[in-house]
Amino acid sequence: NKKGDRLFADWTGTSEQVKGAINNTLSFTKAATYCGVKCILPNDIPANEGFFRCVEVKAPPGTIANGVLPAACAARGLTGFRMVDCVLGALAMMLPDKVMAASDGGNTGISIGGYDTERNPFIYGDFACGTWGARPWADGLSGNSNLFANMATQSIEVCEAENPVEILAYEF
């Protein structure tokens, strides 16, 4: 919702907090909201108090958008990634020519464990990055982490050099 020079993001109606670790803190919900808004702004607008002051975020306590203790939140990124997509969807209704489509919704965690040929145990963990949504003026970008994430997939060479695994294909 926009009024004058202010934008209002209201997460009322969001599901109640859950036992699983996908609950957000209010600060994380605000950050996801700011991320979605920042995506449509010119690059020269800094993410500072002036920007934050123009975006008001409301998230009722006790929801996955604003969990209260003892709400688990270690996997909050999975919810936060989708929240960015929700913000972009809302903004697309106001500015359809400036907003990209939803992304892959979050990175997929990969865990492989076992024993190498000398019976030494190993554990390999990585996150498979998907794609950003298509933009009104171009295709989406493949192989990037979610807009709200700060991670990248390890290179195949590093994966194979440090673990007893062989990557047969690398594609989405």
Give the positions of each predicted feature.
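Glycine/proline-enriched, intrinsically flexible loops and inter-domain linkers
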Residues: 1-172
